[in-house]
């Protein structure tokens, strides 16, 4: 369908996009889309790595009913590999005591 577009139609589509979003917002939108794509790609790689790590043991083990203690260190979510400007700490639910 996209291959059937003529050059004039492509120019008209670009003009409509510029009119809708404005020339100032388009670079920011493209940058945001690129960051989102990098995050999605890194998360997909991490999931594949986790799946490979859990699938590697082929021996049967007995399930342990104990719950491991939660870590008290703060975790950080990083938007993209090497992108330290958008790193932020994870806000975890903490019990509140109100009198």
UniProtKB/Swiss-Prot annotation:
Cellular compartments annotated: Cell membrane
Ranges of Low complexity composition bias in the record: 53-69
Q: Which UniProt keywords apply?
A: Cell membrane, Membrane, Protein transport, Translocation, Transmembrane, Transmembrane helix, Transport
Spell out the molecular function terms from Gene Ontology. Answer: protein transmembrane transporter activity
Q: Where is this region: Disordered?
A: 46-99
Task: Give the residues annotated as coiled coil.
Answer: none
Polar residues biased stretches: 84-99
Q: Which GO terms describe its cellular component?
A: TAT protein transport complex
Topology within the bilayer: Single-pass membrane protein
Listed GO biological process terms:
protein transport by the Tat complex
Q: Does the keyword Secreted apply?
A: no
Query: Organism's domain of life?
Result: Bacteria
Give me the segments passing through the membrane: 1-21
- Per the record, the major location class is membrane
The UniProt similarity line reads: Belongs to the TatA/E family.
What subunit structure does UniProt give?
The Tat system comprises two distinct complexes: a TatABC complex, containing multiple copies of TatA, TatB and TatC subunits, and a separate TatA complex, containing only TatA subunits. Substrates initially bind to the TatABC complex, which probably triggers association of the separate TatA complex to form the active translocon.
- Tell me the function of this protein: Part of the twin-arginine translocation (Tat) system that transports large folded proteins containing a characteristic twin-arginine motif in their signal peptide across membranes. TatA could form the protein-conducting channel of the Tat system.
Q: What is this protein called?
A: Sec-independent protein translocase protein TatA
Q: Which organism is it from?
A: Streptomyces griseus subsp. griseus (strain JCM 4626 / CBS 651.72 / NBRC 13350 / KCC S-0626 / ISP 5235)
Name of the gene: tatA
């Amino acid at each position: 369908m996209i291959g059937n577009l003529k050059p004039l139609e492509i120019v008209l589509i670009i003009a409509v996009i510029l009119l809708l979003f404005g020339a100032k917002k388009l670079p920011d939108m493209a940058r945001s889309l690129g960051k989102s794509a990098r995050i999605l790609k890194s998360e997909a790689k991490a999931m594949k790595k986790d799946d490979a790590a859990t699938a590697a043991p082929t021996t049967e083990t007995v399930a342990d009913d104990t719950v491991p203690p939660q870590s008290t260190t703060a975790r950080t979510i990083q938007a993209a590999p090497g992108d330290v400007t958008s790193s932020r700490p994870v806000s975890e639910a903490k019990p509140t005591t109100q009198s």
